[in-house]
Amino acid sequence: MRPLPWSPDTVPLMLAPMQGVTNRAVRQVLAQWGWPDVLFTEFMRVRPGADNSAARLSQGDLADARPHEHGVPLVAQLIGRDREVLVAAAREVQGAGAVHLNLNMGCPYGRMNVGCGGGMLERPEELPDILGSLREAITGSFSVKVRAGYADPEQVFSLLPVFEAAGVDFLVLHARTVVQRYEGHADHAITARVVQQTRIPVIANGDICTVEGGRRVLEQTRAAGLMLGRGALRDPLLFERLRGRASAAPAEGELRGTHQRFLRELAQRYGALFCGDAQVLSKLKSSLAVMDVPEDSKPYRALRKAKSVEAFCEAVEALAA
């Protein structure tokens, strides 16, 4: 097993990769004062090159191929369907600086589901070859982010021997099926059974939004760690709360101050990362949309209704007034 992207004898708390949301700016802000143990890139879409064997990755993706973000280990996530192209992409991303690589086998959305992401679970017979070839090509840690199954939540148990034989270093399990998308609830009873049945470290993912919920999942599953998504954007201090280094629940009014700081710093970074007022505003509102802020609150309504970055920033300053 290669060195994992977290310190031994710790229970790692990871920021989930969320396409269109956890971009470089979000990761940098959270790395500086949210303190996740591990960060993931948004998925890097792998397409065939001109000769159908080389990978074609965007320059933006390659710019994110680095070993860490502000000192926090960074895992580069790939999404694709063809073995040769995925292997070429893994080599290219490592050549650009990535150390830890992850294969997305869980994305449930249609355009990514044609054989990619969660769509790979419709072709389980191809997985030994794909995973084995990736393992040979990856010199650092190699992990898989996977759903419990495509339509059958028991499918993951038939995949565990495949993951073990391929030498996968750790699994991130979102305990829903692909067809569920984000409906219903993540079934962490499945996570607990997976932990019991594999020697691979398992990171629990899905519906972990509070300290109480996170601790319950750890106790129920005995997972090696947790991956936080929307919960960490709603409350960037959730990582520290889970460690017991911040209050278990935000005090009254505390979240507004946290959101103010988060959105203020994000707006500053987005100005350098994206082009033009319209794109920056769109990205800010995308972040706001996953923060699960109160819909009936006047300060948050002002953020949603802002027509310019300037108006958005003015509304940010009014949040904790």
Could you describe each region identified by the protein language model?
Residues 2-4, 9, 18-92:
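Glycine-rich, positively charged N-terminal anion/phosphate-binding segment
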Residues 54-56, 116-121:
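Short glycine-enriched, charge-decorated loop/helix-capping segments at active-site entrances
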Residues 1-14, 19, 25, 129-132, ...:
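Alpha/beta catalytic cores of nucleotide-metabolism and tRNA/nucleoside-modifying enzymes
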Residues 120-124, 184, 252, 256:
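Flexible, glycine- and charge-enriched loops at secondary-structure boundaries
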Residues 21, 81, 107, 119-120, ...:
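Gly/Ser/Thr-rich helix-start
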Residues 13-16, 39-41, 74-78, 101-103, ...:
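Hydrophobic faces of well-ordered beta-strands that scaffold small-molecule active sites
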Residues 32, 87-101, 105-115, 125-200, ...:
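Alpha/beta enzyme core
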Residues 42-46, 101-110, 175-177, 207, ...:
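Glycine-rich phosphate-binding active-site loops on the catalytic face of alpha/beta enzymes
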